[in-house]
Amino acid sequence: MSSVHPNRARDLGEVILGYGMIVGVIWAPENLQRILSPVVLVLTLLVVLACRQGRDELGMGWRGLVRSLWILPAAIALTALSMFVAAKIGTLHPLYKADFAHISGYLLWTVYQQFLLQDYFMARLLRLVSNEAAAVTLAGALFALAHLPNLVLTAATLVWGVVSCALFRRYRNLWTLGLAQGLLGLCFAVCVPDALHHHLRVGLGYLRYT
């Protein structure tokens, strides 16, 4: 007889399966990514929605929104400071594909990344790991490792992954965290040389960057 509680076994299975699918997409050729990405997006969304949590519980409602709004000006201030320093040391450069469609699409993507991190992975890790700090650290590590082999982005996302998980535990709002991540990601893209982060690409796309 198994000593693993059925619910814990399910959580572990969903973490492994979800992360495996995401990493598989990241390392797939670009033409295959276009097919697999929406499939994985829908599957992970359905798994979360199957839990029948309310919008506030998912972090998509009004709960914590006002109290967490300080995160956005903090992200803007950090962005401004980083751009000032980058300009002084000569690494500041134009954004790759700076049109509205790409920027807005990127911001939507960072909101969904926070949805995956908090509502899919963090929620299950909290049930699997009795220590909240350990769950936050583990979630941040999984988030960062998904950005390999982009080492500079992996280091940055390790910090942000842990910080954003801790902030979500306090405020439980995805909107401020997703938008803050988008701002910081765009800042990273223009302040760190493309030669290091390859237009923020990860997985196979990073290795095939020219």
Report each predicted region and the residues it spans:
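Functionally important transmembrane alpha-helices
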Residues: 24, 154-209
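Hydrophobic core segments of transmembrane alpha-helices in multi-pass, intramembrane catalytic enzymes
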Residues: 37-44, 105, 156-164
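Membrane-interface helix termini and inter-helical loops of multi-pass transporters
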Residues: 56-61, 86-98, 198-205
